[in-house]
């Protein structure tokens, strides 16, 4: 009898679900994140929150703000752990130039949506996003409810 294969766990560490509701997501980018050792250990333990995070461009470099990485209890006492510090994003120059040009337009911002593992590295999925108005959010909710109703009707009509 062969051994059972270990289940493949998801590579996703944290997700910003609020971003899909608050913004029209347009262009997707994958960025590396410059992290310290204690941050990687905390991310492996799942102590990360990116729900209110966003990206700013400063001096031609991209930084992640608003992401919280809580230090582990057994973290070293001689290292100061700052949970909400700004973290540099590692992007190619062409991607960075595209983000700089697009984010300067009125109504556009750069939002972090997912942090995940790609091999041994933590990667961040960021989107160029345009803010939704409240009526757009209501339209999205109505459309989602209608899709659920349609699925329910089709399910019962087949019987």
Swiss-Prot record:
InterPro entries: SmpB, SsrA-bd_prot, SsrA-bd_prot_CS. Its main location: cytoplasm. The keyword Coiled coil does not apply. GO terms for molecular function: RNA binding. One of its GO terms (cellular component) is cytosol. Pfam families: SmpB. PROSITE patterns: SSRP. One of its GO terms (biological process) is trans-translation. It is found in: Cytoplasm. Keywords: Cytoplasm, RNA-binding. Belongs to the SmpB family. HAMAP family: SmpB. This is SsrA-binding protein. The lineage of its organism: Bacteria, Pseudomonadati, Pseudomonadota, Gammaproteobacteria, Alteromonadales. The gene is smpB.
